[in-house]
Amino acid sequence: GCHELRGYGHSFSSIGLGKAIANILGTPNYFGSEARGLTWTAILQDAEERAAEFRGDVRARLQNPDRFFPKVWKRAEAVAQGELTWQEYSDEVREWEEKIPVSIRHLLDIKPRPDAKLVDPSDVDLRVGNHDMPIIISAMSYGSQGELAYRTYADAAKMLNTVCMNGEGGELLDMLGKYKQWRGQQVASGRFGVNIGFLNSADFIEIKIGQGAKPGEGGHLPGFKVTEQVAASRGTTPGVALISPSNNHDLYSIEDLAQLIDELKTANPHAKVSVKIPVVPGVGIIAVGVAKAGADIITCTGYTGGTGAARAHALRHVGLPAEIGVWLAHRSLIASGLRDDVELWVDGGMKTGRDVVKMMCLGANRVGFGTLAMVAVGCTICRGCQDGTCHVGITTHVKTKEEADRKGFKAFRPFEEKGSPHGIYNVFCAVTDDIRKWVAKLGYDNAQDIVGKADLLEQISMHDQIDLSDLTKPIPQRDGMPAQRGGLRISRPRNIISRQITEEVARYVNKGEYELTYDDEQVMAHDRALGTHLCGAIKRGEIPDNERLDAVHLSFSNSAVPGNGLGAFIDEPVTILAEGGAQDGVGKCAKGGTINILKVLNHNGARLDGSVGKSFAYGAQGGFFIVQGDADTRACIRMSGADVIFGGMIHEPLRDDLGGLGARANLKGYAFEYMTSGRALVLGDPGPWICAGMTGGTVYQRVQPE
């Protein structure tokens, strides 16, 4: 929608404004004070200098923004190749931090306490959970990355015993489950390749709310990057451009987020669920909401975190630094008594172990590296990732010099010349050694003990322009939440029926029954994600003799209207019948199977309802679905392969002059948005704004001129 200019005010923020200016602008302002920050005098001086340039009194010079990585990437690559010591690289990075500080952490130094105990760096324990280090390889997707680079990141994480997060581009089929304990799979707005097998192939599942480099924007993979292999992993059509919506269309509130987290944990009860949020104004409150929604991990991604494929305006003007995100999230979670319930991860332009220690002091449990991992396999920071002409073979699907010559590349170096898991291994091992040295200097023998100890940092430069005293204050610890009368309150799990169905099916399969019908006449709106747990158990091999299972029919009758997520992530051999209707998220990310939502007989013998809620078949890659009634907004959004029939009929001539087009249609608006493949048959009014952003698939519309 369109707003007046002031309608966008909540999206703006500032860093380092003096209090007088900040009060007038009225935006959230970080690290400014009465005594320090941008003043009217400084603004006047800047205006006078610009005026002098404009008049020609002095020579005008166009100021280029300072860029950090282009100045050090060669040194990082040399470390990966074993041609330079980490200390030499780290010292050079520190010199540039002093010359052109481009991040808040560049204004901070690590300050050991006078009474710090002596610790040998080799005695410092870096382990977090089942992994050996508090650093991870940040999410990068297949498609944006070429196959060789993409595989290399996963192999390196396994060698290092750390986590490699996957981007939103699905997974190469031969990699599914191969790196389970070292892998995180991403569920983003496009839902590319997200299905029950995908969700059960990793120990971490990340819901991507946004990206630090471009919060509020969706992704775009050009058609020339969608090869047959990329299309297979994403469940789409080769050569067709892929567009991610700007937001997840089943997430409009914290309650919706809680529902999706619940669905993912139903699909894979063994996985930890992370929620990735860009650093924006109010990030602390957002983090508290995410924790209350049931996430295990919160990832704050700063404005330098992201991709060379982001648009220039986003790279330059959008988002906030990672330091602000992790600082506010950590403090807000402590104030709410929720900090111990979640891990806090952060990424965004990290380059050294010193960066990691600073972010941990601000509140992070783990710190992500994305660009540095790319540099370790040969990236030259040319910022042409979206062009498909990467001259070092990282973000292109061209693998040989001959192929590059045929396609007119100006230069090309095959990936294998510099890229290997050993390069990343060398760099990340050097980072961990760096972390050990700094943690030992601070007097700790466990890296997690420095988490949130911001008083171990001190501001060392730009004291007049920015006030970091709030950032480096000790954080008051809260002694848990006040005790509740009657002890801890617990309630009925929303997905308990979904789990009971699995138990019943397993019991009868054990008796040699390989085709079953589970009938339930009492399901209600609070019974959510029905069929999801069963499909996950089948995929994990937890149902005995599951390869002999012919079909499992789930029948919900007697005016049943199951709760959200009916048949979410469904696959063969499961079929679902609901007589009455269903709520939001039916059949989302289905890979196969059948879902029939039918009308039900009322006491007068008339058949009524048979409708579904919002985001029906969101991201569905397969399966056959029939809806005898109507569908709420965004039916079949981002669908890529399923077959769907909507049976709701037009019963009287349409009157567009009455307004409310969506409310009076059979499909309530935005149907088939961003669809890439699949087929749909609409027997009634398809509603307004259909097929926006659609790049493939077929929609058949019944024509009724009368």
Regions found by a protein language model. Name each.
Residues 260-267, 317-344:
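Alpha-helix-loop-beta-strand connector modules within alpha/beta enzyme cores
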Residues 225-232, 295-306, 316-329, 362-413:
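Flexible glycine/proline-rich, aromatic-decorated loop/lid segments
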Residues 1-232, 421-426, 432, 436-440, ...:
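Conserved, well-structured core domains of diverse proteins
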Residues 157, 257, 290, 298, ...:
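Conserved, mostly hydrophobic/aromatic
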Residues 276-282, 341-354:
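Glycine-rich beta-to-alpha transition loops that act as phosphate-gripper elements at the mouths
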Residues 1, 5-11, 16, 39, ...:
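Glycine-rich phosphate-binding active-site loops on the catalytic face of alpha/beta enzymes
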Residues 425, 436-442, 451-454, 473-706:
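Long, distal/terminal scaffolding or interaction modules
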Residues 130-137, 233-248, 265-270, 304-317, ...:
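Gly-rich Lys/Arg/Thr-decorated short loops/hinges at beta-loop-alpha junctions or inter-strand turns
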